[in-house]
């Protein structure tokens, strides 16, 4: 390849300060023609942000990049002296000092008739204060006047010009005087309206109380006073009559404490009628309902008198409640306008009225209770006859299996009970009796085992016979009898044959039976390196330690006869001397040691035989050959048994 064909790899582009250098770059340019740009200038100090409203943002070349020096930034100037604080109440205090004389002249003009009620005047140094209790009733005209005047004064203070300082000092006192005069007059008229309203409510209360006094019945008052006259010292009417005077006194005291003056002039105001109470309607409805309810008399002579007395009492109590409700309603309007002293008086009046009502109702309730007791005494109550209990349910008869199971349990319980009774101390029973009991138990157990075996065999034969004809066997043909060979096999075995086989099997020894070895994976042997390892036998003349079993415990089931023998041996041993039991002769110990060593050697010889057999291949080959021979013999037997079936099928096919 020539040098012209080799592509030129351009260098990595570098960042430039402006866009002008980017426009001059062309991709086809060679690496030699590229010029490295100059590095940017890094400022030594952090730039300070300038205000956006400055005029030199576009003119200075340095500001275009957003960098400014410390010399161009102008710092704010800190004043040397702290500004003086001006108070807003100084001018008002000056105006108040100049208006005290004018206020005294206004009071003299207003209170010509009663010079004693004039205010004593204020000192020059005192500042007017706001009253503690705000007047509740205020007229719309006075509030609007005071608001407009105060707004005018505020506007005059705010609209201040430096050129009008001399004129402003003259105008302000005049405006402030007018506002104070108007406010003072409005307060005096408000106090007059409050006093007039209170007097009107008091007059209305006196009228309603006087009317109620005429309606109260003398009979009811006599009954109430005779019951508990010591509780009430004065009637409720007198307490209610004293309320208006106490209300007026308290209001006059409040007015004097606030520094305000009350006027005794009266204004005529229309009377406000009382709202009709709902209690009257409810009480009238309740009385009508009580009168309409019929009462069934037991004795006609006595019950009529009781009914007449109760009806009169109910009517009198309803009228009393109506009158007292009217009195409470008339006083409630006055009590709402009063102060804390009025509330206390009202609560006292309510307590007195409730006590009087409770005293009036107590004798009525007692008499009504007596009337109910009289009626209940004369009504006979017949108790209900107790219901007879039905006959007990008849228990269901248990099924045959349950009955047999219950009998079996009862028999077992009886046997256990008899065995417990037979367990008497040996001193009372003889050894011959105990042996007889043991023989009886053995015979019973053997008989039960025989019966169970016979039952199981009989059930099996029945089950096999019931399956005849259901499943097709190899030698069976449809719609024909079974062959003779199958009938012999399927026939029920006789009891004699079963017993003979049992005797034969019982005579065989268990030791002659071949025990099968657990088969493992075939064809797998140990590796040659492991199998060829020679055992090392250390033949040292040093002493050797042998570990063997010194004693052994065998647990076997014990029959009752054996238990009796054991108990007798224990008793005989206890009677013997303790020393003779504990001492063991040397001959016995030697015999035990020799027997234990022989057992240990036998155990070790068996282990070595097993290991040698596993390592030898000849033993495995012999076992394999024996298994193959046994399988061949079994196949021959099966074929010999199937020959009669083949003859039958061949005869059928030929025929």
Swiss-Prot record:
Residues 19-33, 54-67, 337-350, 414-429, 490-499 have a biased composition (Polar residues). Disulfide bonds: none annotated. Residues 217-234, 351-378, 430-457 have a biased composition (Basic and acidic residues). One of its GO terms (cellular component) is actin cortical patch. Keywords: Cytoplasm, Cytoskeleton. Pfam families: Aim21. Residues 79-89, 136-147, 308-319 have a biased composition (Low complexity). Residues 514-527 have a biased composition (Basic residues). Residues 1-99, 114-171, 209-400, 414-457, 490-537 are annotated as: Disordered. InterPro entries: Aim21. Its main location: cytoplasm. It is found in: Cytoplasm, Cytoskeleton, Actin patch. The keyword Ligase does not apply. The keyword Cytoplasm applies. Belongs to the AIM21 family. Involved in mitochondrial migration along actin filaments. This is Altered inheritance of mitochondria protein 21.
